[in-house]
């Protein structure tokens, strides 16, 4: 059932980025997703704040309707990071073995990844480099 959803809407740049971490550093897919998701949420938040607000309201934060977009993004990202920390997931791309000198190669591969077109916001190679760097 999840696959049907993926094929209808795409997966976006979280998966474009984590596929590279798995391929290059043998990082488990779920761990890589947990590391990359908060950074990409901040990036996509510029065009997804209303969706984030709706999710926050539905997970018990009715006050989210009164928050400005930046506070919605920050609150949602914080919730995701807290969950990740609570279950003991590593928090940085550095923990996968990634080094600064690898970022351009990872970004090139992420640009070519089939999941990229499903992202709600356009992304460039430079964006990918910056996103990986922010996740370090």
Regions found by a protein language model. Give the residues of each.
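Amphipathic alpha-helical interaction segments
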Residues: 16-19, 35, 54, 75, ...
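Histidine-centered catalytic micro-motifs
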Residues: 11-18, 25-30
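Glycine-rich phosphate/diphosphate-binding loops and the adjacent beta-loop-alpha structural elements
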Residues: 1-8, 19-22
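Short alpha-helical scaffolding segments that buttress acidic/His motifs in well-ordered protein cores
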Residues: 2-3, 17, 37, 80, ...
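Flexible, glycine/charged-enriched surface loops at secondary-structure junctions
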Residues: 8-14, 66-70, 90-96, 103, ...
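Charged/polar positions within long, soluble alpha-helices
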Residues: 4-7, 11, 42, 85, ...
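Short, amphipathic C-terminal "tail helix"
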Residues: 99-136
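Gly/Pro-rich interdomain helix-loop hinge
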Residues: 24-102
